[in-house]
Amino acid sequence: MAQKIVRVGDIQIGNDLPFVLFGGMNVLESRDLAMQVCEEYVRVTEKLGIPYVFKASFDKANRSSIHSFRGPGLEEGMKIFEEIKKTFKVPVITDVHEPHQAQPVAEVCDIIQLPAFLSRQTDLVVAMARTNAVINIKKAQFLAPQEMKHILTKCEEAGNDRLILCERGSSFGYNNLVVDMLGFGIMKQFEYPVFFDVTHALQMPGGRADSAGGRRAQVTDLAKAGLSQKLAGLFLEAHPDPEHAKCDGPCALRLNKLEAFLSQLKQLDELIKSFPAIETA
């Protein structure tokens, strides 16, 4: 089964290629912190030879509480992304929540992301597709892997086939998520690159009453399990001080563990992709 390759600048993204990292922080807490986090990601990924795209949100529009921190907003967020791109020479990915945001975000960011909670919103999907930007489509917690085909079709019929699928876990009762490893193979049948968002798969939605809890201690185990499925890439959030992060700190990898973490994952990815395919159907 031929697998599509999506190109972002000099980076080639495909299920049979070395894994690509979409990594950064959950939300743009400040310009200085974003620069600090990106600098460490760039240092580590350059050392290890991992293709890298910086990730952060300019607005967290789906926080549990109305009092929760949301970010700097569209205008200021794009300024920070422009500075990061200029300073570190890396592509940037961020999420879009409303149709009117799609075009201005696509003019700055190399990849625009369709949030899991909004992945069936046709007007948003079409607006994003019409920018012709690369789109990272998060699989909603309530969707089966095979249902992602409908979202791909919406994008394709709007004229965009520069698409990536991203698993982030499925609802398992209340305040819990699980990852079905068989789902990766189902989504790969659509031939588009498939990523694994290990950070948000560790969430415990609403687990702290007014915010999400998480299981940071299990990030390495889950990331290894995901990449064992021969994926195009990993989606990861890290923070220098997770206990005081303004969003999803309980899920974030400690930034000072990034090199050791990615070193093991690179070795695993190389091993998995060295194996010949076995036809078992």
Swiss-Prot record:
One of its GO terms (cellular component) is cytoplasm. Pathway: Carbohydrate biosynthesis; 3-deoxy-D-manno-octulosonate biosynthesis; 3-deoxy-D-manno-octulosonate from D-ribulose 5-phosphate: step 2/3; Bacterial outer membrane biogenesis; lipopolysaccharide biosynthesis. It catalyses: D-arabinose 5-phosphate + phosphoenolpyruvate + H2O = 3-deoxy-alpha-D-manno-2-octulosonate-8-phosphate + phosphate. Its main location: cytoplasm. It is found in: Cytoplasm. One of its GO terms (molecular function) is 3-deoxy-8-phosphooctulonate synthase activity. Keywords: Cytoplasm, Lipopolysaccharide biosynthesis, Transferase. Gene3D superfamilies: Aldolase class I. One of its GO terms (biological process) is keto-3-deoxy-D-manno-octulosonic acid biosynthetic process. InterPro entries: Aldolase_TIM, DAHP1/KDSA, KDO8P_synthase. Its EC number is 2.5.1.55. NCBIfam families: KDO8P_synth, PRK05198.1, PRK12457.1. HAMAP family: KDO8P_synth. PANTHER family: PHOSPHO-2-DEHYDRO-3-DEOXYHEPTONATE ALDOLASE (PTHR21057). Belongs to the KdsA family. This is 2-dehydro-3-deoxyphosphooctonate aldolase. It comes from Pseudomonas paraeruginosa (strain DSM 24068 / PA7).
